[in-house]
Amino acid sequence: MRLSRCKLRNSVLWLFGFLAVILVAGTSVAQENSKAGADPHFDIFAEDNYPSASQCAVCHQKIYKQWASSNHAYASISPMFHKFEQAIYDLTQGTIGSFCVRCHQQVGTQRGEPREAPLWERSRVAREGITCITCHRVTEEFGKVNGERNIIPGNIHAPIYNTASGSRFDEILKKKEELKIATSDKERGAKIHSKVIKFAQISKSEFCVSCHQ
């Protein structure tokens, strides 16, 4: 009789121990999912479909420095912009929607970040305002669209679009090993885009009019 009770007690203890392990594991998964939902950087670091200007700076240091002190770089974080945007939003009782942020935070808008999201909850690339990919990942002529144009997603190795005027990119690719650069995730070296595709309109005012009307 005592032996049976001992076996029963051990079985109950084993069952409770097993349930405790499942509970802890489930809590850990829930915490990870919670972090993914709460951290606006989680998906961008995981998929990296909208590269930051800091990634481009590895090669384009001079251009990065020029951009970093420009109005474009401050378009998303400017306190004056946020004051004016909120005032207009209130005056129109919200009917303007994302009219302002479509230009000032174009990447963030395309990523689905809500207009009212505070800066500290936005992705890094959204806080960069008019960043590199805002222009160099556009492949179509949109005209006057108040920022409603499509930015082609893709990691740092995806093609970029430029005038290709005076480009020596093909020469650089021939020296990949010497320069220690990588055009794919399978290669080692400084990560760069794999291709430059000519897009003539990027050098014309018609391209800028998508926002600057």
Regions found by a protein language model. Name each.
Residues 4-5, 15, 58:
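The N-terminal extracellular segments of secreted preproproteins, especially immediately downstream
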Residues 14-24:
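Bacterial N-terminal signal peptides
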Residues 29-128, 133, 140-203, 207-213:
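Sequence context of c-type cytochrome heme-c attachment sites
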